[in-house]
Amino acid sequence: MNHSEARGSGGHKGYRGRSQASEQWVPVAADDKSLEDSSGNRVRGSQGKGRSRTSWSPRNSYGRGNDEHSPVQAYVNKSNVGFVEKGVQQDRKSLEDGIGSTKQPDDGAAAGDNKAVLQSKSTNVSGGSFVSSECEDKDGAKMYCDLVNRVNDVTLSCQESVSSTVVQKVELSSVEDQKSAPKADGAGNSSNESSTRHFDIFLEKKGIVLKPNLLVLSREKKKAAKGYSGTVIRPGMVLLKNYLSINDQVMIVNKCRRLGLGEGGFYQPGYRDEAKLHLKMMCLGKNWDPETSRYGETRPFDGSTAPRIPAEFNQFVEKAVKESQSLAASNSKQTKGGDEIPFMLPDICIVNFYSSTGRLGLHQDKDESENSIRKGLPVVSFSIGDSAEFLYGDQRDEDKAETLTLESGDVLLFGGRSRKVFHGVRSIRKDTAPKALLQETSLRPGRLNLTFRQY
């Protein structure tokens, strides 16, 4: 139970009346002003109307001698006491810190306040800053307690006991521990603790979110109005610049977020040697296991099933493949070379989220079926959010790799003769995501990348 103490100096000038009928002091208020208690109620000074009798004890005279016995003792209710300290002896550190511990008459009564009920006999409230109270519990044991009542500076309130507060803290701590405890998979495997917690690609909204600059929004709208442009990067590799509109990107982000928080959602992938990929991953259609480089229906470490690919995603892919085929055919006529891109129907989508420090080394997408690889069925990649420095080449050598900037809304396709191209992400360019996209979603800083392929 929290408690503060302040001592008065000398006798209070308001106590000047003395009763001749007994050895008890009757407090007389210095003026007619009412005293306002902590709850906003008005408490009248004792001008003969309340006639509350107040006892005093030499033990509480605090060494002032017999010159003036100020009536500084009062009986108070427990419910009216803001800060109570039982016992005359008190730890000096508790006094300095303003925290006192209430000792119960019985050790077994420490768990509850119902065994130590303070019974009020009389109460005296004066305009002074210090009141010393004498309390009596139900067992008849005397207790001396100090009550701080600074009306202008301190608001007195009923406080719960320290024991009940500690119990509440323990209960809350237990609930938080249960929430943060990692869930074991069906086989009892609790490894990859951080991996079992679904990653949220949205930031938690806090406070007021400022709207983006109108000039920036206007520039982005003009860019979107121009439509997309297609470029053949190399035989079998096509870049569709600004292919996905802001509305399309918002829809994709929202669906990925919803899927990512459910079964089979985003997690931290790793390898057998405990090395971790610098990204978060979620598989749709089929699960890809980085430890075995194989596809399956479920994830080995938690047994979750890969969610289905949304129909809207497949529609974007089919249109992008057809557009790429048209561009590749036109380029093939100009170069008089066989630059064909086969058509494909995606049944796998790997969704990766790169943070601002995310990256991915050069690699080949060659874990699909032999038939898919042999036919050169294309891989289609969507980029949303911050821009990425994309690497590609015929060798696993970053120094010899070509560089391409993939911005939000871009679609990259590589198939045919470029199906086995080495590719990766060197870095993410911070704060390059479209402001309009961030205004419509709470996408956290980074890049959301979806790669579609047919097994």
From Swiss-Prot:
Organism name: Arabidopsis thaliana (Mouse-ear cress)
Entry protein name: DNA N(6)-methyladenine demethylase ALKBH1C
Signal sequence interval, chain numbering: none
Main location class: nucleus
Superkingdom to which the source organism belongs: Eukaryota
One cellular-component annotation, GO: cytoplasm
Location of this chain's protein in the cell: Nucleus; Cytoplasm
PANTHER family (alphabetical): ALKYLATED DNA REPAIR PROTEIN ALKB-RELATED (PTHR16557), NUCLEIC ACID DIOXYGENASE ALKBH1 (PTHR16557:SF2)
Alphabetized InterPro entries for the sequence: Alkb, AlkB-like, AlkB-like_sf, Oxoglu/Fe-dep_dioxygenase_dom
Gene3D superfamilies per UniProt: Alpha-ketoglutarate-dependent dioxygenase AlkB-like
Comment on bound cofactor: Binds 1 Fe(2+) ion per subunit.
Keyword Iron assigned: yes
One GO process term, biological-process aspect: DNA repair
